[in-house]
């Protein structure tokens, strides 16, 4: 079970790192030079700081549930939803931009969601809910 905890802590750390980056200078998370168009993530970020909040919630849920060894499956499922939402917004937004926006971050986010889903299954197989 130590391996599951280690990976869960690392995954929580990745979400919390994104929060810190989002709260830092915008040059750390926004790519200039896409043109006058804005991505879907930027549109939502301009309304409210949704993504720092979502990544904080996801990271803290995974961190605390792993420490307590309770609710880990649900925490990873929530984190998977956050990463999938973020990744899909990046990828779908890139489709509509001319020229298309880079999709690397969106692709990484989708795979992070898949890894969180896999971790939720791995914890469930260990009998931890």
Positions of the model-derived regions?
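Conserved binding/catalytic microenvironments
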Residues: 26, 55, 61, 98
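Juxtamembrane helix-break-helix junctions at the cytosolic face
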Residues: 59-74
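Hydrophobic transmembrane helix segments
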Residues: 4-53
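Membrane-helix boundary connector in multi-pass membrane proteins
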Residues: 70-73, 77-80, 84-105
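Interfacial segments of alpha-helical transmembrane regions
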Residues: 2-12, 72-79
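Membrane-water interface at the C-terminal end of transmembrane alpha helices
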Residues: 109-129
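Alpha-helical transmembrane segments of polytopic membrane proteins
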Residues: 45-55, 101-110
């Amino acid at each position: 079970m130590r391996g599951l905890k280690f990976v869960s802590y690392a995954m929580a750390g990745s979400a919390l790192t994104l929060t810190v980056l989002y709260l830092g200078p915008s040059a750390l998370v926004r790519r200039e030079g896409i043109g006058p168009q804005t991505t879907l993530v930027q549109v939502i970020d301009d309304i409210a700081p949704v993504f720092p909040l979502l990544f904080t919630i996801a990271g803290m849920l995974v961190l605390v549930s792993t420490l307590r060894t309770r609710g880990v499956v649900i925490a990873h499922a929530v984190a998977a939803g956050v990463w999938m939402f973020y990744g899909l917004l990046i990828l779908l937004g890139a489709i509509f931009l001319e020229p298309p926006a880079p999709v690397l971050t969106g692709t990484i986010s989708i795979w992070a969601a898949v890894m969180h889903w896999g971790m939720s299954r791995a914890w469930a197989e260990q009998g931890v809910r």
